[in-house]
């Protein structure tokens, strides 16, 4: 998170990694009016419940995208740290392009915002993941990375992210057991994706159950 941030969150991390302002991130992510990514804690006492729900859902969706693409890269042979860096870089690069478009009068609304339930936006991210992972692996000197295995799984990984993020989008509160169950599916998805990539790397055909969720 940027220096001076009161909370560390996926949104503040995007700011720090992308060199973006709070205003740019809030607009690209379509955060509720008045929400400061550096200070807003959806679980703090007295926060607006509607804003808290919206912000936490977006945070969960960002984490689903980053961690799932990272799991695919790790399963294909990248280090855990390198895989996360590659996935985060892929997301940040797309967000930065959207932020640059905020001042472009010819850009469409979709080109100025990111929706982690939209296949089109997830496709922009997935197109960067394999190259980003390869770059990180090369810089680290990690051996055993199989780019083809990762490339073979990015489509299903993106589809699975969309399916889980659609479930997150449908959440109506932050406290019910149903919500906690939805938020906990992220870990299950990550394990499925990593295992599928490991299978692909070993010469098999990896599959992700959440592709059909």
PLM feature spans:
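Feature for extracytoplasmic/surface-facing segments of secreted or surface-associated proteins
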Residues: 1-213
């Amino acid at each position: 998170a940027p220096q001076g941030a009161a909370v560390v969150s996926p949104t503040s991390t995007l700011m720090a990694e992308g060199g973006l302002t709070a205003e740019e991130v809030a607009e690209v992510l379509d955060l509720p009016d008045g929400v400061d990514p550096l200070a807003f804690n959806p679980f703090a006492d007295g926060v607006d419940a509607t804003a808290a729900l919206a912000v936490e859902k977006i945070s969960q969706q960002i984490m689903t995208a980053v961690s799932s693409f990272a799991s695919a890269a790790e399963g294909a042979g990248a280090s855990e740290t390198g895989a996360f860096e590659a996935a985060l870089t892929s997301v940040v690069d797309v967000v930065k392009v959207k932020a640059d478009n905020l001042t472009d009068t010819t850009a469409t609304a979709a080109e100025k915002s990111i929706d982690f339930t939209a296949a089109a936006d997830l496709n922009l991210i997935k197109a960067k993941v394999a190259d980003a992972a390869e770059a990180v692996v090369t810089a680290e000197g990690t051996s055993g990375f199989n780019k083809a295995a990762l490339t073979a799984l990015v489509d299903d990984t993106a589809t699975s992210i969309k399916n889980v993020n659609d479930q997150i989008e449908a959440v109506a509160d932050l406290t019910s057991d149903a919500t906690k169950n939805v938020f906990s599916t992220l870990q299950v998805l990550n394990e499925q994706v990593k295992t599928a990539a490991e299978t692909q790397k070993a010469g098999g055909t990896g599959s992700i159950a959440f592709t059909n969720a």
